[in-house]
Amino acid sequence: MVEKSLAELNWESLRANRKFFPSPNAWEDQVLYFLMLDRFSDGNENGYKDNEGQIVKSGTTPLFTPGDAGNAFKTPEGEHKWRESGDRWLGGTLKGLTTKMGYLKRLGVTAIWVSPIFKQVSFYDSYHGYGIQNFLDIDPHFGSREDLKKLVETAHQYGIYVILDIILNHAGNVFSYEADDTPWPGSYPVKGFNDPTGKPSIPFGPVDLNKNPEAWPNGAIWPAEFQTPATFTRKGYIRNWDNYPEYLEGDFFSLKDLYHGTGSIDDYQPSPTLLHLCEIYKFWIAYADIDGYRLDTVKHMEKGATRFFASVIHEFAQVLGKDNFYLIGEITGGRLNAYTTLEETGLDAALGISEIPDKLAYLVKGYRDPNDYFRLFRNSLLLQKESHVWFKNKVVTMFDDHDQAERGGGKARFCAGEKGEKVVLNALALNALTLGIPCIYYGSEQCFNGSGDSDRYLREAMFGGEFGSYQSRQRHFFNEENPVYRELAKILEIRQEKLTLRRGRQYLRPISGNGVDFGLPQIIGDEIRSVVPWSRLLDREEIVVALNTDYNQPRTAWVVVDYNLHQVGDRFQCIYSTDRTQVETTVVVEDRNVKCISLTVPAAGFVIYEPLKG
């Protein structure tokens, strides 16, 4: 039974005789995987490996093959249906996701970040989950509360943490204004709460189910504590997204802004609404044994509200034995904004730092100066922080995502371009083996190539359905033989084995073509085709990693290594290369006024070298 009111929650039974899954000691050791639940798995796939590694033969959807590309575009009607399907519910479920823990575990994923799962307004196709109507229930498209509990239990059995995407800033389109056009800043009268069809037929106040039985479960807003005008700011929709206080008070399009309280960050007075939100998200931690939250749209909340919420949640999680419950904030903008927001609010990590995706993706493709990416993580007067201490567990890094909010213009996954598939492994490896908590966006390991004029093209279905990647339909993509999946799994296994690759300091290394003249790799003209090496150092260990931005031929370069850690004649051994024949080969440390080694990196390839011991 789903409670209609917070007063009905039985906190004693939620915590009695339970041992909760402990937090990881270090989140920088984890590899995150972000998935949109509606687009991930419906559980009907055939020919994939189950959680134990056995081939499933009972499904109905076959595995995608290259010959299936474009099978949805054979007729104009088929193309139209494919595009339209991208804006609707497709059928991914919690049960389907539960069957893919083996797929994720074998890839090297240690934590999943799941898009919002809570009950949505019933008259919109809000498959993305950001339009909540009942904060205490799971949307029936996704399954049930028990399905969530089973998912988390299974994930924990496979050593995978579960982070839920949550919303504090707004609810779904749960009421209608009297006016048709309601731009901020207004003080707009409300017609009523919306019924299951979207009509504002329910009085705007505490719901009497005897008079309005249609309000449960699909009308108004739940739990009942939210059924008061004071829950909402009611000032109309945002037009100027960077205008203060418009971006704090305004509705997010049709999504209704919630009123959190008032006051400065040090003297913030939470509203009843914010107190209720705290209770709701405490409930989900206890009910399902959740390990972390990703907070949506932190920019649109007062920092005092964010800090109050973070404090309450961290305290509650500690009572359950989750001493490192992680709160990741979507903090758009640059590094300085991320730093100040984290320092002031008590959030644990920032996601959405604007510079990272662009500089990472285009470095790999050869169109950004390598130092533009690596200097993002350097000791900086801007941050007044020692970089390797701060960035290692304070920033979640990724290059593909579900909305590309900071990029503007058209939407495109990394592999949408002509050569993206050639070097996507390099992008995934660069993300995994540099500072920060790496996050993989679902489908990147299968070279998803969506692009277009809206977010839907970034949200193809892994299980195929009517909106698969490569303009396909009814073909799934859980292919563990895909070369990118297979090679990334090897790289992530090495990352898991090598503490230095997870926690070490990092330095972009100077290179030389002749062994005499050394300098940092840099773009000349419009592009760079070169070895790009960097070192990770922890205590007295150095591991050298390098990629090649030349798509067509191997590149060789002398690469500087730490002068004090290595002696002339010492050897580095290749522990990974996209050219398997290089693995276990060695190179010698030479003195050419600097200590250096000569590395050859395959075309569009990637290598990892460590000192040969003994």
Residue ranges, per PLM feature:
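Short, well-ordered beta-strand segments enriched in hydrophobic/aromatic residues
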Residues: 542-549
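Short acidic/polar active-site loop segments enriched in Thr and Asp
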Residues: 110, 291, 438
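C-terminal beta-strand-rich structural cap/linker in extracellular carbohydrate-active enzymes
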Residues: 31, 586-614
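Active-site clefts of carbohydrate-active enzymes
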Residues: 391-417
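Active-site rim elements
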Residues: 18-19, 84-90, 267-269, 294-297, ...
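Substrate-binding/active-site clefts of carbohydrate-active enzymes
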Residues: 18, 24-30, 38-288, 309-320, ...
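Conserved, mostly hydrophobic/aromatic
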Residues: 35, 104, 114, 135, ...
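Active-site-proximal helices and loops of the catalytic beta/alpha 8
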Residues: 7, 152, 156, 170, ...
